Curated annotation (Swiss-Prot):
Alphabetical UniProt keywords: Lyase, Magnesium, Metal-binding
UniProt protein name: Probable terpene synthase 2
Binding annotation for Mg(2+) 3: E457
Keyword presence, Lyase: yes
Protein task: Probable sesquiterpene synthase.
InterPro entries: Isoprenoid_synthase_dom_sf (IPR008949), Terpene_cyclase-like_1_C (IPR034741), Terpene_cyclase_plant_C1 (IPR044814), Terpene_synth_N (IPR001906), Terpene_synth_N_sf (IPR036965), Terpene_synthase-like (IPR050148), Terpene_synthase_metal-bd (IPR005630), Terpenoid_cyclase/PrenylTrfase (IPR008930)
The keyword Metal-binding appears for this protein: yes
Motif residue range(s): DDXXD motif: 305-309
EC number: 4.2.3.-
Further comment found in the protein's record: Does not produce any detectable product when tested in vitro.
GO process terms (BP): diterpenoid biosynthetic process; hydrocarbon biosynthetic process
């Protein structure tokens, strides 16, 4: 797009800036006027949830056959209530692991695949050799398996937990995908829609709350549904939704008070989308303070990103980067007026959480979060230099910076800050030293983002993305580049699965945050950048999670 000039005080006159023209916030003040529920009603809902929760615990305890245990756990996960029973599920899956699973009734494709998936998801490294029994002498999957739709769907879901060198799971994914795609046109509309959704978003890459909201509506139409589980899931979803609505109202008021929409009109106004993003990282009630902090950080980072990408001159960005590195309010006088607004907001967000952490004796965590922010803006400045020189780096050079500028290392460290006693200094040391699982999640983030957004960014004037870098370095077409990147994304997911199975690793809650970050990218960037260009997928997802009750 054409360069535009925007006059702001303290700037050199007639400074030419390449503006991105992001579309405005589509939600208006909707979430500012979230109606407060009667505390009596919420108290009653909480009491019902606690009563039903005890009934579900009895169900888990009374399940003794492996298939019964596995199907119940699968159901609890899909309904979005498994977070209530983490200890019980861990013990039950350990029990299943120790059981003899060779009985005929647990030997069908569905049971074997479900057992494999749930155990791998729990971080237990079970062998993929369990699927050998479903192959013929030539190593191909037996064609009669296609008569078992439930088994084929379960095998498809299990195959997404593959790691490098597991050719049988590569074959399983190809086998099930080809078959499921072939039958969709001949199925009834509801079943066709359900399988199409599964093909687009397998459980390994789905967002927990989005999946729960969808599955609750499917499960209630099942005539064999368990009334206790359905009632529990709906009550729990609606109670959590009320909490999330209150959080978003609080965040929206904070955002409105900052008035970035008027003070920094060249930036993206995506406070609702930012909150949805963080809901994908963690939705559980115990992380309510963490969600508020990280949502504020992510929204300020979005503004900072736009300052580096779409507005600031190189001279201004050098000063801005130095100010963030110094992290001192006295630096504010060196900044142009528009940067002062953002800089003050950034320091205030961290100061607010630092006060809360100091009361708990955890203020050391902010050091890690601040260092991650400093690394991020340093990467932004390198990219701004490239842009200023019209420089196209090599892929290795580009990725060394882009895996930081994608902000996933920052998101990882920052998401741990409010996670309670389990977030030890050792966890922060680990997260701050480029662990492989964070690095490969960042690869997924960067490549998926670049694939869908590079055309828009090149039109407005932007650094060369990985797409342009790879095409230039290898002399190949855009289509060939996309194919190569998609292969790298597949490999990155295998790396994530592999890291998830490592013994003596960081605790599961931290691994889950990283996996969830990769899931968000797969969900929102599969066809377009749904954060920058809010489309039907984002609109529908926000409505399902934050507006419409179950």
């Amino acid at each position: 797009m054409s360069a535009q000039t925007l006059a702001i005080s303290n700037l050199k006159p007639n400074t030419t800036r390449h503006l991105a023209s992001f579309h405005p916030n589509i939600w208006g003040d909707r979430f500012l006027s979230c109606a407060a529920e009667s505390t009596d009603i919420e108290d009653d809902m909480e009491q019902q949830v606690e009563r039903l929760k005890e009934e579900v615990k009895k169900m888990i305890a009374s399940a003794d056959e492996p298939s019964q245990i596995l199907n119940l756990i699968d159901l609890l996960q899909r309904l979005g209530v498994s977070y209530h029973f983490e200890k019980e599920i861990e013990e039950a899956l350990q029990q299943v692991l120790n059981m003899n699973s060779d009985s005929d009734k647990d030997d069908d494709l569905h049971s074997v695949a479900l057992r494999f998936r749930l155990l791998r998801e729990q971080g237990l490294n079970v062998s993929c050799d369990v699927f050998n029994k479903f192959r013929d002498r030539n190593g191909h999957f037996i064609q009669t398996l296609k008569t078992d739709l439930q088994g084929m769907l379960s095998l498809y879901e299990a195959a997404h937990f593959r790691v490098h060198g597991e050719g049988i799971l590569d074959d399983a994914l190809a086998f099930t995908t080809t078959y499921l795609e072939s039958i969709v046109p001949n199925l009834s509309p509801p079943l066709a829609a359900q399988i199409s959704r599964t093909l687009r978003q397998p459980l390994r890459k789905s967002l927990a709350r989005v999946e729960a909201r969808h599955f609750i509506s499917i499960y209630q139409e099942d005539t064999s549904h368990n009334e206790v589980l359905l009632t529990f899931a709906k009550l729990d979803f609606n109670l959590l939704q009320k909490l999330h609505q209150k959080e978003l109202k609080y965040i929206s008021l904070w955002w409105k008070d900052l008035d970035f929409v008027n003070k920094l009109p060249f930036t993206r106004d995506r406070v609702v989308e930012g909150y949805f993003w963080i809901l994908g990282v963690y939705f559980e009630p115990q992380y309510h303070r963490a969600r508020k902090f990280v949502t504020k950080v992510i929204n300020v980072v979005s503004v900072i990103d736009d300052i580096y990408d779409a507005y600031g001159t190189l001279e201004e960005l050098v000063v801005f980067t130095d100010a963030i590195n110094r992290w001192d309010i006295d630096c504010i006088d060196q900044l142009p007026e528009y940067m002062k607004v953002c800089y003050k907001a950034l320091l205030n967000v961290y100061e607010e959480i630092e006060r809360a952490l100091s009361e708990q004796g955890r203020s050391y965590r902010l050091h890690y979060a601040k260092e991650a922010m400093k690394k991020l803006v340093q990467a932004y400045l390198v990219e701004a230099n490239w842009m200023n020189k019209n420089y196209v780096p090599t892929m290795d050079e580009y990725m060394s910076i882009a895996l930081v500028s994608c902000a996933y290392p920052l998101l990882t460290v920052t998401s741990f800050v409010g996670m309670g006693d389990i977030a030890t200094k050792e966890v922060f040391d680990w997260a701050s030293n480029d662990p492989k699982i964070v690095r490969v999640a960042s690869i997924i983030c960067r490549l998926m983002d670049d694939i869908v957004s590079h055309e828009f960014e090149q039109k407005r004037g932007h650094i060369a993305s990985s797409v342009e870098c790879y095409m230039k370095q290898n002399g190949v077409s855009e289509e060939a580049t996309r194919d190569e990147f998609n292969k790298q994304i597949v490999d990155a997911w295998k790396d994530i699965n592999e890291e998830h199975l490592q013994p003596n690793y960081v605790p599961m809650p931290f691994r889950t945050r990283v996996v969830n970050s990769a899931r968000i990218m797969d969900y929102l960037y599969k066809d377009d950048d749904e954060y920058t260009h809010v489309g039907e997928l984002m609109k529908g997802s926000v409505a399902a999670l934050l507006i419409d009750p179950a």
